[in-house]
Amino acid sequence: MIDPRVLRDEPDRVRAAQVKRGLSDEVVDHALSADGERRRAIAAFEAKRAEQKQLGKLIPQAQGEEKQALLAQTKTLAAEVKQAEAAQAVAEEAWQAALMSIPNLAADEAPAGGEDDYVVLEEIGTPRDFAADGFEPRDHIELGRMLGAIDLDRGAKVSGSRFYFLTGAGAELELALVNLAMQQARESGFTPVIAPSMVKPRAMDGTGFLGQAADDVYRIEGQDMYLVGTSEVPMAAYHSDEILDGGALPLRYAAFSPCFRKEAGSHGKDTKGIIRVHWFDKVEMFVYTTTEESYAEHQRLLAWEKEFLEKLELAYRVIDVAAGDLGLSAQRKFDCEAWIPTQGRYRELTSTSNCTEFQTRRLDTRGRFGSEIRPISTLNGTLCAITRTIVAVLETHQQADGSVRVPKALQPWLGREVLEPVTT
């Protein structure tokens, strides 16, 4: 959640941030009203408690009828105190709900607008010219079939639409990508983590995924648990309710986990293949650091993402995501999009967000800096989302006979230079 002091002291700044995201600014007035109600409820409760304490001092000194009258008054006042306490709890809950509904304040540098209002920051590499190579590129579905790497028919038979099996070279390619990603992360100072893919509601809500993204989340009926759409969720909750040593920051983690997404708003989009699926595996970078250092750390996360894509010898671009497409918790987000030859366009492969103090305030994670305890910041960044990366690698490095050249960085993990077709 945002800093309550910013809401109280700079409400116009919060209103402007809402408008920049394309959202109504009425939520600001609602939150300020809830804050006022909460303060009045606290004052009323404290006044009743003070009256109760004062009355308690008079009773031992009273005698006879006066004492009986005071005792009767005590009973009445006790009920009023209980009522005032309940009213305070209701007001506090309403205030917290109002505050939690406000998204992080988008960075001044983030473009205004929605999904299509991003700004292209740079383009790296040149999309391959298949005409010059003398053949028409196959899409990843056909390549996956020829290589015996992707089985969509059996995925649909067993689990339904947007599911798949990775087999043979496909399974090997996933493991190679995970190993390469984890090797890079470890060499860059990250601690490898295998994260749980089921979490309690607080972890999901604390990361902002029960707000705008609630429709895309799988809930396990009868258990009050959720399947995560990214290991950002368990890693943000990893240090919940903790005070970290400020001198030990940054803490960098590289977490591997399955990711589950309903893709509720994606009807009719990418219905074939493995670009948009209900389940995929991912290596995610996650960082705890000071707010002051978070902006430079964000650039470092982007640099590590770019390094990984360049190891895979992919043409890609970096975009500055517009405020309306940031999601609840992000202050700023950069996406790396790889060129997909058969689609003739760039598609998102990685994303990195600076969430500043938004998640740590919700999850009560703070840092100790000498005698001071204060909120810290979190950042996240995709190092390798497996299925989309497989799509980009297969389509970019395919050869005329349906074989696929293995990028040099992956060759030690795959043990060969070329993936050969098993069928035509």
From Swiss-Prot:
GO cellular component: cytoplasm
Residues annotated as binding ATP: 261-263, 277, 348-351
Chief localisation class: cytoplasm
Recorded metabolic or biological pathway in which this protein acts: Aminoacyl-tRNA biosynthesis; selenocysteinyl-tRNA(Sec) biosynthesis; L-seryl-tRNA(Sec) from L-serine and tRNA(Sec): step 1/1
Top-level taxon of the source organism: Bacteria
EC number of the protein: 6.1.1.11
Family, per entry: Belongs to the class-II aminoacyl-tRNA synthetase family. Type-1 seryl-tRNA synthetase subfamily.
Protein's name according to its UniProt entry: Serine--tRNA ligase
Organism of derivation: Nocardioides sp. (strain ATCC BAA-499 / JS614)
Gene designation: serS
